[in-house]
């Protein structure tokens, strides 16, 4: 083999390896990608059946039903135009309420019922976790105390 043929062989092998790595990476991203659909899109048959995706909307007022086991909850997610029945087995987030925003992750069954394996309650932009609110309150108090002390020392 000449030097040129060896170089060409190494270049081709590197290209094949790079192509395989790219294909594997793209395949991994595609399998982990979860799409978001509204109830109107689901009613229009735009959402895949038996494939994982996210459903977002509002919890319809008067739709929450708890089963006897205490862990299975049925409710309807609506976008005010259409509604999708959801069944979830597990603990709901503290912010889960009727009329509030929710994002559920799961699969749409053949019967049109969305079987959720995760439910996230959405909150408005004014929400602040209690720990963050306490930390902010303490920081404000420290700043006010420092301002008072510097004002006292400046007046002396």
From Swiss-Prot:
BP GO annotations: cytochrome complex assembly
Segments crossing the lipid bilayer: 8-28
Ranges facing Periplasmic side: 29-156
Positions contributing to heme binding: 123, 127
Keyword Signal found: no
Bilayer topology: Single-pass type II membrane protein
InterPro entries tied to this protein: CcmE, CcmE-like_sf, NA-bd_OB-fold
Record Pfam families: CcmE
Alphabetized GO MF terms: heme binding; metal ion binding
Keyword Metal-binding found: yes
Domain of life from the UniProt record: Bacteria
GO cellular component: a single term: plasma membrane
Name the record gives this protein: Cytochrome c-type biogenesis protein CcmE
Taxonomy of the source species: Bacteria, Pseudomonadati, Pseudomonadota, Betaproteobacteria, Burkholderiales
């Amino acid at each position: 083999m000449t030097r040129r043929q060896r170089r060409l062989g190494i270049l081709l092998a590197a290209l094949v390896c790079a192509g395989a790595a790219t294909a594997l990476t793209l395949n991994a991203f595609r399998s982990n990608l979860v799409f978001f659909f509204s109830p109107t899109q689901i009613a229009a048959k735009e959402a895949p059946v038996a494939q994982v995706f996210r459903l977002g909307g509002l919890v319809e007022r008067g739709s929450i039903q708890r089963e006897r086991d205490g862990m299975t909850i049925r409710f309807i997610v609506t976008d005010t135009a259409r509604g999708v029945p959801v069944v979830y087995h597990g603990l709901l987030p503290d912010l889960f309420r009727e009329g509030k925003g929710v994002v559920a992750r799961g699969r749409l069954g053949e019967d049109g019922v969305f079987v959720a394996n995760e439910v996230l309650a959405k909150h408005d932009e004014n929400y602040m976790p209690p720990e963050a609110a306490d930390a902010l309150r303490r920081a404000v108090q420290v700043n006010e105390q420092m301002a008072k002390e510097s004002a006292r020392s400046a007046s002396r």
